[in-house]
A protein has these predicted regions:
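Short hydrophobic core segments
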Residues: 12, 100-111, 237, 245, ...
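FAD-site-proximal beta/loop scaffold in flavoenzymes
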Residues: 122-151, 243-246, 252-324
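C-terminal, flexible cofactor-proximal segment of oxidoreductases
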Residues: 325-419
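Beta1-alpha1 glycine-rich phosphate/pyrophosphate-binding loop at the start
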Residues: 2-78, 82, 168-212, 259
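Rossmann-like NAD(P)H-binding beta-loop-alpha module
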Residues: 136-194
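FAD-binding core/adjacent interface of flavoenzyme oxidoreductases
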Residues: 1-6, 74-162, 259
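A Rossmann-like FAD-binding core segment of flavoenzymes
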Residues: 72-87, 178-287, 291-293, 342
Length: 419
């Protein structure tokens, strides 16, 4: 409880779920404390656009303090959570010490799951955090600059990219890198031929987009091929080295870049809570998103295994799921503080979607309706613009997207190095 007698709501994590919870608590008669190891919120669905120069860092990363600056009942701390004691209702932090709580919103997200693949943690480029995307952007530019200085590197696969994962993250990333290569880079580096810079998408399963209808999978495959992406299904990665990728089939792909978009697992802190975890290190929750046995604890976002009441399926780790679950937690706590009865969580499906490149996208709604092409890309843009936290961010994204579409010029195409 806060020093003034108000209940304290502790929000762990400043992602979609944490920020969504804080926004719904803005007018609650409570002290709201949001803690994240970073001082910024990351818009994860657009990280691949940062990595390929379609958007600037400021369009993907947003100051948490700025986002919540109008919340008079909210404070933000930059700190790393060490432990959570569910019985004592207390969280421990290295930087700010212990914090007790009356309500806890556990939204610490996930981390990349390499599935034990040898060499992947050391050599792969994940696509889950702002530093991940910035590091990949600099690496891609550096490889082309290195090959421009020393063309013999091309034969070693310096410009080749392997993208792992046939879901939305992998497909969007592969399509964006292929367009970057076939468009801007081949123009800027005239000594490189298209066949010298290959983009390969590998998926361990028998097909891309297993959650989509066959016609959408076929469309995605054709759109990737049209952009120069080689698609390999039934191709599991055995190991990763700095300059090559070995598949379990025995095939070796020469490549200095491997982007990992193959899966996530819940934040490792959950393993210390003494809970029975579900697949992918995720925490099972009740219909109201509270932790069974702990009605004051809400688990939300990528770390939560939320069963959809309509389909009885566990909801995917998507930005829309994280945001809606966080908003539900914040709204429920605000109701409880005011003496009102909260409602069960009901997910409003925005569709599963991916954009593959300029004018190419796929959308599948919960009821089975599908879209492809420019219409699907417009729907994709509308959904993602709605997820952006401020109108300023939405306007900036539209300007950057429009500039790339009409001029084929990208905004983020320099590397900043130490003098």
């Amino acid at each position: 409880m806060a020093s003034d007698g108000r209940p304290r709501v502790l929000i762990l994590g400043g992602g979609f779920a944490g920020v969504g919870a804080a926004q719904k608590l803005q007018k609650a008669d409570a002290e709201v404390v949001l803690v994240d190891r970073h001082d910024y919120h990351t818009f994860q669905p657009l990280l691949y656009q940062l990595a390929t120069g379609l958007l600037e860092t400021t369009a993907v990363g947003h100051s948490l303090r700025d986002l919540l600056s109008r919340h008079k009942n909210t404070v933000v701390h930059k700190a790393q959570v060490k432990a959570v004691d569910l019985e004592e209702r207390r969280a421990e932090f290295d930087e700010i010490g212990p914090l007790s709580y009356d309500y806890l919103v556990f939204g610490l997200g996930a981390e990349v799951n390499f599935f034990g693949t040898a060499g992947a943690p050391a050599h792969a480029f994940p696509m889950y955090t702002l530093p991940h995307a910035a590091r990949l952007k600099d690496h891609l530019l550096e490889r082309w600059e290195a090959a421009d200085r020393d063309p013999s590197l091309i034969e070693d696969g310096a410009l080749n990219v392997v993208v792992v994962g046939g879901g939305p993250t992998g497909i969007e990333t592969a399509g964006a890198i292929a367009e970057l290569y076939r468009g801007d880079f081949l123009k800027d580096y005239p000594g490189v031929a298209p066949e010298d810079a290959r983009v390969t998408l590998v998926e361990a399963g028998p097909e891309l987009f297993p959650m989509f209808k066959p016609k959408l999978r076929e469309y995605a495959d054709e759109a990737l091929t049209l952009r120069g992406v080689e698609v390999k299904t039934g191709a599991a990665v055995a190991s990763v080295e700095p300059t090559r990728v070995a598949l379990k089939s025995g095939e070796t792909l020469p490549a200095h870049t491997l982007v990992w978009g193959a899966g996530l697992q819940g934040n490792p802190l959950v393993q210390s809570l003494g809970l029975e975890l579900q697949r992918g290190n995720r925490v099972g929750v009740g219909a109201d998103l509270t932790l069974p046995g702990y009605p004051e604890v809400y688990v939300v976002g990528d770390v939560a295994a939320i069963t959809d009441a309509k389909t009885e399926q566990v909801l995917p780790q998507l930005g829309s799921v994280a945001l809606q679950s966080g908003e539900h937690a914040g709204e429920s706590i605000a109701h409880r503080v005011a003496g009102k009865q909260p409602k069960p969580f009901e997910y409003k499906d925005k569709g599963t979607m991916a954009t593959i490149g300029r004018g190419a996208a796929v959308v599948q709604m919960l009821g089975g309706k599908t879209m492809t092409g420019k219409k699907a890309q417009a729907a994709w843009g509308a959904v993602h613009l709605a997820l952006l936290p401020t109108n300023e961010d939405r306007a900036k994204a539209v300007v950057d997207w429009a500039g790339a579409a009409f001029t084929h010029q990208r905004v983020g195409r320099i590397t900043v190095e130490a003098d």
